[in-house]
From Swiss-Prot:
Cofactor remark from the record: Binds a second Mg(2+) ion via substrate during catalysis.
Cited InterPro entries: Enolase, Enolase-like_C_sf, Enolase-like_N, Enolase_C, Enolase_CS, Enolase_N
Protein name, per record: Enolase
Gene name linked to the record: eno
HAMAP family per record: Enolase (MF_00318)
Pfam families: Enolase_C (PF00113), Enolase_N (PF03952)
GO molecular function: magnesium ion binding; phosphopyruvate hydratase activity
Cysteines engaged in disulfide bonds, as pairs: none
Similarity comment: Belongs to the enolase family.
Length: 426
């Protein structure tokens, strides 16, 4: 029986230059694997707790030495000797060990690092790719990437309110062709921005951060880039938004669009989305309303839920209980999947299974603070999520995931690229 022999955590850096955890697990056959935990910038208030040191003399208070120590002492002590390939049991032990609903004691960053590293070590020991270990024989589907090519909101220092403007290459037969087309659009967009004397500096997720004066200009220039690159707008490549509305709302559920000097209530904002969807081939809107505006979400879902994908990120925070509430209230029709929002691989799996059971789409997602770790690429294929958000075709921490998906596609001798089939069920 393969058991856990050793566990260790190290403070390393993420793509924003902030510290994060690298956890390593050694098994009884001396197989070793590591995992690096990501970190978000715009976070939902109900996310599991990311434990930081708050020691202002180190990393401006963002150190993770306490979380590392939790791995190297408490977690290590209680997990050594447990069966390695029983992921659910080990993850449940981690939850019990912490004793809080949101990992406030050990830190979700400490717990997730160990959970990820254990899965990777177990797969390695069994000589299986991670996607095959986690997903079994059914792990065959390559996800449609949602590439964030213009950044705004908290991901960029500009006047654009919406956090992410994305392209979705739906009209292609393979992942590699979809990615190639996306890269070509990205480079074409850069030339167009240069021609408009716009900055082509990039945000946290590799998208450009031009200083446009309103939230419509990015849709216009991206549409131009798609067509100039030689692709059919809406047919081969569609558009998607992550509004991150929780960053725009006040205590009265009024939404402040500073780039356009507008203050809108929930119904007015939904009307604005309807105008955009009518004018542009937008197939998905994420966090269209605040995580606390459930009444507004119900209206948004009623007005647009049969027409486009409505993704809950801050709304659900990868939490099965919150997703169940959304299902019961007919709110949204898709859930963003971020393992570090909930804490362990097993809890993430629970949320994905619940979503699939109720015909909610699943979007595997990175965080704005990432690393070279490509775990979510395997995870997306393992669970056939059908979609993945992992930034633009720039910045190596984003490219690491795309390159891993290209490897997986090659290993699967093509696999299945879901493409246009993604939204056909609805």
């Amino acid at each position: 029986m393969l058991t856990i022999k050793d566990i260790h955590a190290l403070e390393v850096m993420d793509s924003r230059g902030n510290p994060t955890i690298q956890a390593s697990v050694v098994l009884s056959d001396n197989t070793k694997a590591s995992a690096i935990v990501p970190s978000g910038a715009s976070t939902g208030k109900r996310e599991a707790l990311e434990l930081r040191d708050n020691d202002k003399t180190r990393f401006l208070g963002k150190g993770v030495l306490r979380a590392c120590e939790n791995v190297n002492s408490v977690i290590k002590h209680h997990l050594i000797g447990l069966e390695a390939i029983n992921q659910a049991f080990v993850d449940e032990r981690l939850r019990a060990l912490d004793g809080t609903p949101n990992y406030a004691n050990l830190g979700a960053n400490a717990v997730l690092g160990v959970s990820m590293a254990l899965a990777r070590a177990s797969a390695k020991a069994l000589n299986l790719p991670l996607y095959r270990y986690l997903g079994g024989a059914n792990a065959l589907t390559l996800p449609v990437p949602m590439l964030n090519i213009i950044n705004g909101g908290t991901h960029a220092n500009n006047s654009i309110d919406f956090q992410e403007y994305m392209i979705m290459p739906l009209g292609f037969e393979s992942f590699k062709e979809a990615l190639r087309a996306s890269a070509e659009v990205y480079h074409t967009l850069k030339k167009l921005l240069d021609g408009k004397n716009q900055l082509t500096s990039v945000g946290d997720e590799g998208g450009f951060a031009p200083n446009f004066s309103n939230n419509v200009e990015p849709l216009e220039v991206i549409s131009q880039a798609i067509e100039k690159a030689g692709y059919k707008l809406g047919e081969e490549i569609a558009l998607a938004l992550d509004v991150a509305s929780s960053e725009l709302v006040d205590e009265n559920f009024n939404y402040h669009l500073k780039g356009e000097n507008k203050i809108l209530d929930s119904h007015e904002l939904v009307a604005y989305y309807k105008e955009l969807v009518a004018k542009y081939p937008i197939v998905s809107i994420e966090d269209g309303l605040s995580e606390d505006d459930w009444e507004g979400w119900a209206f948004l879902s009623k007005e647009l839920g049969r027409q486009i994908q409505l993704v809950g990120d801050d709304l659900f925070v990868t939490n099965a209980s919150l997703l169940q509430k959304g299902i019961e209230k007919n709110i949204a029709n898709a859930v963003l999947i971020k393992p570090n929002q909930i804490g362990t691989i097993s809890e993430t799996l629970e949320t994905i299974r619940l979503a699939k059971h109720h015909a909610y789409q699943c979007v595997m997602s990175h965080r704005s603070g990432e690393s070279e770790d490509s775990f979510i690429a395997d995870f997306a294929v393992a669970l056939n999520t059908g979609e993945i958000k992992t930034g633009s075709t720039a910045r190596s921490e984003r490219i690491a995931k795309y390159n891993r998906l290209l490897e997986i596609e090659h290993e699967l001798k093509g696999g299945i690229y879901i493409g246009k089939e993604l939204f056909k069920h609805g």
